[in-house]
Protein backbone atom coordinates (compact mmCIF):
# COMPACT_ATOMS: atom_id res chain seq x y z
CA UNK A 1 0.00 0.00 0.00
CA UNK A 2 2.99 2.30 0.41
CA UNK A 3 3.24 2.86 -3.35
CA UNK A 4 -0.45 2.43 -4.21
CA UNK A 5 -0.97 5.94 -5.54
CA UNK A 6 2.08 5.80 -7.79
CA UNK A 7 1.30 2.30 -9.02
CA UNK A 8 -2.31 3.05 -9.93
CA UNK A 9 -1.27 6.22 -11.76
CA UNK A 10 0.86 4.26 -14.26
CA UNK A 11 -0.69 4.72 -17.73
CA UNK A 12 -2.25 1.56 -19.12
CA UNK A 13 -3.24 -0.13 -15.88
CA UNK A 14 -6.80 -1.27 -16.48
CA UNK A 15 -7.69 -3.43 -13.50
CA UNK A 16 -6.68 -4.15 -9.95
CA UNK A 17 -7.77 -7.35 -8.25
CA UNK A 18 -8.10 -7.55 -4.48
CA UNK A 19 -8.67 -10.62 -2.36
CA UNK A 20 -9.29 -10.67 1.39
CA UNK A 21 -7.34 -13.87 2.01
CA UNK A 22 -4.22 -12.58 0.23
CA UNK A 23 -4.41 -9.27 2.09
CA UNK A 24 -4.88 -11.10 5.39
CA UNK A 25 -1.80 -13.23 4.72
CA UNK A 26 0.18 -10.07 3.94
CA UNK A 27 -0.77 -8.70 7.35
CA UNK A 28 -0.40 -12.03 9.14
CA UNK A 29 -4.01 -12.04 10.35
CA UNK A 30 -7.02 -14.31 9.91
CA UNK A 31 -10.79 -14.10 9.92
CA UNK A 32 -12.59 -14.23 13.24
CA UNK A 33 -14.82 -17.21 14.16
CA UNK A 34 -17.76 -15.51 12.38
CA UNK A 35 -15.82 -15.23 9.12
CA UNK A 36 -15.18 -11.48 9.36
CA UNK A 37 -11.85 -9.99 8.39
CA UNK A 38 -9.98 -7.59 10.69
CA UNK A 39 -10.54 -3.86 10.21
CA UNK A 40 -7.01 -3.40 8.82
CA UNK A 41 -7.93 -5.71 5.93
CA UNK A 42 -11.19 -3.93 5.09
CA UNK A 43 -9.48 -0.54 5.48
CA UNK A 44 -6.86 -1.62 2.93
CA UNK A 45 -9.61 -2.78 0.56
CA UNK A 46 -11.41 0.54 0.85
CA UNK A 47 -8.21 2.47 0.19
CA UNK A 48 -7.44 0.42 -2.93
CA UNK A 49 -11.01 0.90 -4.16
CA UNK A 50 -10.79 4.66 -3.55
CA UNK A 51 -7.57 5.01 -5.54
CA UNK A 52 -8.85 2.74 -8.31
CA UNK A 53 -11.96 4.91 -8.73
CA UNK A 54 -9.89 8.08 -8.75
CA UNK A 55 -7.56 6.71 -11.42
CA UNK A 56 -10.31 5.10 -13.53
CA UNK A 57 -9.01 1.59 -12.88
CA UNK A 58 -11.51 -1.26 -12.65
CA UNK A 59 -11.65 -2.72 -9.15
CA UNK A 60 -12.25 -6.44 -8.95
CA UNK A 61 -12.73 -8.11 -5.59
CA UNK A 62 -12.82 -11.79 -4.88
CA UNK A 63 -15.50 -12.99 -2.47
CA UNK A 64 -18.66 -11.58 -3.99
CA UNK A 65 -21.62 -13.52 -2.65
CA UNK A 66 -25.39 -13.33 -2.25
CA UNK A 67 -25.16 -11.15 0.85
CA UNK A 68 -22.83 -8.46 -0.56
CA UNK A 69 -23.54 -8.38 -4.30
CA UNK A 70 -26.19 -5.63 -4.22
CA UNK A 71 -23.96 -3.29 -2.21
CA UNK A 72 -21.06 -3.95 -4.56
CA UNK A 73 -23.19 -3.30 -7.64
CA UNK A 74 -24.63 -0.10 -6.22
CA UNK A 75 -21.49 1.51 -4.89
CA UNK A 76 -18.32 0.08 -6.16
CA UNK A 77 -17.40 -2.54 -8.66
CA UNK A 78 -17.51 -3.28 -12.33
CA UNK A 79 -15.97 -6.75 -12.36
CA UNK A 80 -17.16 -9.48 -10.01
CA UNK A 81 -15.92 -12.89 -8.98
CA UNK A 82 -18.92 -14.88 -7.87
CA UNK A 83 -18.50 -17.36 -5.06
CA UNK A 84 -21.66 -19.20 -6.04
CA UNK A 85 -24.72 -19.22 -8.28
CA UNK A 86 -26.79 -17.41 -5.65
CA UNK A 87 -24.61 -14.31 -6.00
CA UNK A 88 -25.07 -14.32 -9.77
CA UNK A 89 -28.83 -14.81 -9.43
CA UNK A 90 -29.22 -11.98 -6.89
CA UNK A 91 -27.03 -9.68 -8.99
CA UNK A 92 -28.95 -10.41 -12.19
CA UNK A 93 -32.26 -9.77 -10.48
CA UNK A 94 -31.01 -6.48 -9.01
CA UNK A 95 -29.69 -5.20 -12.35
CA UNK A 96 -32.45 -6.64 -14.52
CA UNK A 97 -29.93 -8.60 -16.59
CA UNK A 98 -30.64 -12.01 -18.01
CA UNK A 99 -28.36 -14.84 -19.06
CA UNK A 100 -25.82 -15.11 -20.55
CA UNK A 101 -24.68 -11.86 -18.90
List the model feature ranges, each with a label.
Residues 1-101:
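Expand to "…catalyze enediolate/carbanion chemistry for C-C bond making/breaking, isomerization
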Amino acid sequence: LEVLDQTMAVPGIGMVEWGPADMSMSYGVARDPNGNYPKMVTDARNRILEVAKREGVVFSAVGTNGSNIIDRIDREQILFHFANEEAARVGRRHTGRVMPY
